[in-house]
Swiss-Prot record:
The human genome contains a high percentage of proviral-like elements, also called endogenous retroviruses (ERVs) that are the genomic traces of ancient infections of the germline by exogenous retroviruses. Although most of these elements are defective, some have conserved a functional envelope (env) gene, most probably diverted by the host for its benefit. The lineage of its organism: Eukaryota, Metazoa, Chordata, Craniata, Vertebrata. Interacts (secreted) with SLC1A5; mainly at cell surface. GO terms for cellular component: extracellular space. This is Suppressyn. It is found in: Secreted. May play a role in trophoblasts syncytialization, the spontaneous fusion of their plasma membranes, an essential process in placental development. May negatively regulate cell-cell fusion by interacting with SLC1A5, the probable receptor on the cell surface of the fusogenic syncytin-1/ERVW-1. It comes from Homo sapiens.
Length: 160
């Protein structure tokens, strides 16, 4: 990404452009706006749905864990919502099906998680992560030798 510094910016403008009525402030503001717009991650605003709840209209972000490949084309965009990355695609099966695949009905745009799309169930991943945490906790637990306890109460009485 190119950086534009005001000192370089002012000296690099030809004097002819100053006479055409374009102010340096306008050019600087437009340049900064272009730089900021390219740096910001795209939002997932197309994946919000309106819902009436208790007499109020509310917006909810909806995403899917898996969408059939034939429901969307080759144009896959990344978007960010609440710090998490999603894929955003145009729904080619708005009526509910396309090429035999069942597609989400009535939505023009679809967002889906990256990991669920490629055939990995998110519940399986959560279980694997949980097992890893438990295994790590067991490994870090200090091992103490077992105490000499009798296995049965009657063997304890016999020793006395």
């Amino acid at each position: 990404m190119a950086c534009i510094y005001p000192t370089t910016f002012y000296t690099s403008l030809p004097t002819k452009s100053l006479n055409m009525g374009i102010s340096l402030t306008t050019i600087l503001i437009l340049s900064v706006a272009v730089l900021l717009s390219t740096a910001a991650p795209p939002s997932c605003r197309e994946c919000y749905q309106s819902l009436h709840y208790r007499g109020e209209m509310q917006q909810y972000f909806t995403y899917h864990t898996h969408i059939e490949r034939s429901c969307y084309g080759n144009l896959i965009e990344e978007c960010v919502e609440s710090g998490k990355s999603y894929y955003k695609v145009k729904n080619l099966g708005v009526c509910g099906s396309r090429n035999g695949a069942i597609c989400p009905r009535g939505k023009q745009w679809l967002c889906f998680t990256k990991i669920g799309q490629w055939g990995v169930n998110t519940q399986v991943l959560e279980d694997i992560k949980r097992e890893q945490i438990i295994a790590k906790a067991k490994a870090s637990k200090p091992t103490t030798p077992p105490e000499n306890r009798p296995r049965h109460f009657h063997s304890f009485i016999q020793k006395l």
